[in-house]
A protein has these predicted regions:
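Conserved short alpha-helical segments that host acidic/polar catalytic motifs at enzyme active sites
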Residues: 1-261
Length: 261
């Protein structure tokens, strides 16, 4: 996030999903900030949580499994976002990720992205939602409603194991604008998708330990100290989809169109 600081300074947010959590314990967490230095604010608060835990268990860092049970933002799936406000106010409520909660893990969704949609009214009409004042001011709110609508439908067919490819193929054809979106599901599945024109950038890197995606190739290269050819471009209209076991695939969701970026 710090290496892409230039992409947005109006706010920042994090969402975390933990895998293999005992029933009844929280597995989806979110923190957002619109402080003057939002990235620093987020990680200062997380650092405070660690320091507070160390007061009572000084050797806690030697036991990562135990730490995971005590710290909200220690987990396997992380979604970070930097806000550059193009729509809506700069209140913290407009900072990504947005989340939808449900009793079933597979219907919990955290969503963030780099985009500007021009047909939010049409999106709400598509799924029969009457938007409130807040939703009318946020294109992410419209996108979230559509994606979650089709996620719930897919979950009905495959409880807690929705086919993300089908979700995206149903949800994204009516998105009018450039976008790269990232989503985490409460069951440990995740995705990144890029618009058919390639208006917004997206890159990814995969090794034996991590699967990472970002808006800038350089941010991935410098963070993981890898060569330019090791970081791949996510092509227009495609999605990188990952399950809770780390299995991944690249799927064509939309037919690619004339490149605009």
């Amino acid at each position: 996030m710090e290496k892409q600081h230039n992409r947005g300074q109006d706010g920042a947010g994090l969402a975390m999903v933990k895998l293999n959590i005992e029933p009844g314990n929280p597995y989806l967490h979110r923190m957002r900030s619109n402080a003057p230095q939002p990235i620093a604010d987020l990680f200062f608060k997380i650092g405070q949580e660690i320091q507070e835990l160390e007061k009572y268990q000084p050797d806690i860092k030697q036991h990562p499994g135990l730490m995971k049970g005590h710290l909200p933002f220690l987990g396997e799936l992380l979604l970070g976002h930097l806000r550059y406000g193009t729509q809506g106010k700069n209140n913290v409520e407009f900072c990504h990720p947005f989340i939808k909660r449900d009793l079933m893990p597979g219907k919990n969704l955290a969503l963030a992205g780099n985009f500007n949609l021009v047909n939010t009214d049409e999106l709400f009409e598509q799924i029969g939602v009457n938007p409130g004042d807040f939703q009318k001011q946020s294109d992410l709110a419209a996108m979230m409603e559509v994606v979650h609508h089709y996620l719930v439908k897919e979950d009905e067919a495959n409880p807690n194991n929705a086919n993300i490819t089908n979700v995206l193929k149903n949800a994204t054809p009516i998105f009018d604008g450039g976008y790269t979106i990232g989503g985490l599901l409460g069951n440990g599945h995740s995705f990144i998708m890029r618009d058919a024109h390639g208006i917004r950038p997206a890159y990814y890197y995969i090794n034996d330990e991590v699967i990472v995606a970002a808006s800038e190739r350089a941010a991935i290269r410098t963070t993981f100290n890898v060569g330019e050819n090791e970081v791949q471009e996510l092509m227009p209209g495609t999605a990188l989809i990952v399950d809770d076991l780390g299995n991944y695939r690249i799927e064509k969701i939309l037919e690619p169109k004339e490149r605009r970026a």
